[in-house]
């Protein structure tokens, strides 16, 4: 396998601390990543060349967090330009969702981002459904880092953002129909929004854990905090 076939994906439930971890590791001199420019202009891969300035001492310290300086991004617009259902699927994405066209698109995207950024490894973050089967079909040697934040902290965080889909109830969110067990837990908590956010956390943590069995333990790391 060549270096383009071994990307690393940092994954979690959402509101789980993916960004702080990526802030710590993504600026390693060997790592390339999709930036806000790749997300805004998905087909202009040459914009990854801009990310090279992060390696300059001045931009890697004093100006690192200015808006115009390239930074890692949950680049859903980029991924969605390669597979229309990537951003907000109602279920997880699996091996059977990948056809040859999709596979070639994702491989090309990773290869070009690495090429223009001039790095030997690729890392990216995304949240929600695991998408492990999907990416494992495209990149058979890819690795995953699963960030599990305390469910109480995640539930509290979800209840403090306006865009959480749980505000509109379980029939408008993306995490499927609740099992009888989970529905009764929610019901017994007076249909609490906090309880529903905790249930969302449980659904997604279990989804990622279950699908992690697709890959070997050497390619899957879990970090809890």
What are these model-predicted stretches?
Residues 1-7:
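Extreme N-terminal, non-catalytic leader segments
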Residues 28, 34, 56-57, 161-165, ...:
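Phosphate/oxyanion-binding loops and surfaces in catalytic or ligand/nucleic-acid-binding neighborhoods
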Residues 19-30:
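A conserved segment at the C-terminal end of the G1
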Residues 32-35, 221:
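Conserved catalytic segments around the Walker B and adjacent sensor/switch elements
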Residues 11-12:
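The Walker A (P-loop) glycine that initiates the GxxxxGKT/S ATP-binding motif of P-loop NTPases
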Residues 87-91, 95, 111-225:
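PAPS-dependent sulfotransferase catalytic domain
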Residues 15:
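Walker A (P-loop) phosphate-binding loop of P-loop NTPases
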Residues 36-123, 171-185:
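PAPS-dependent sulfation machinery
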């Amino acid at each position: 396998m060549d270096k383009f076939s071994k990307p690393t994906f940092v994954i979690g439930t959402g509101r789980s601390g993916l960004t702080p971890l990526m802030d710590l590791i993504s600026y390693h001199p060997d790592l390339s990543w999709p930036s806000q420019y790749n997300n805004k202009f998905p087909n202009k891969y040459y914009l990854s060349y801009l990310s090279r300035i992060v390696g300059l001492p001045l931009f890697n310290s004093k100006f690192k967090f200015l808006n115009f300086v390239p930074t890692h991004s949950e680049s859903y617009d980029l991924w969605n330009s390669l597979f229309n259902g990537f951003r907000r699927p109602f279920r997880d994405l699996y091996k059977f969702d990948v056809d040859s066209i999709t596979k070639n698109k994702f491989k090309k995207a990773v290869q070009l981002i690495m090429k223009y950024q001039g790095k030997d490894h690729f890392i990216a973050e995304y949240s929600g459904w695991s998408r492990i089967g999907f990416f494992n079909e495209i990149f058979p040697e890819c690795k995953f880092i699963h960030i599990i934040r305390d469910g109480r902290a995640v539930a509290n965080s979800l209840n403090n953002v306006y865009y959480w889909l749980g505000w509109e109830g379980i029939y408008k969110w993306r995490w499927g129909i609740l099992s009888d067990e989970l529905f009764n837990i929610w019901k017994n908590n007076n249909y609490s929004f906090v309880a529903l956010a905790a249930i969302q956390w449980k659904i997604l943590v279990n989804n990622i854990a279950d699908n992690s069995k697709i890959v070997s333990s050497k390619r899957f790391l879990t970090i809890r905090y």
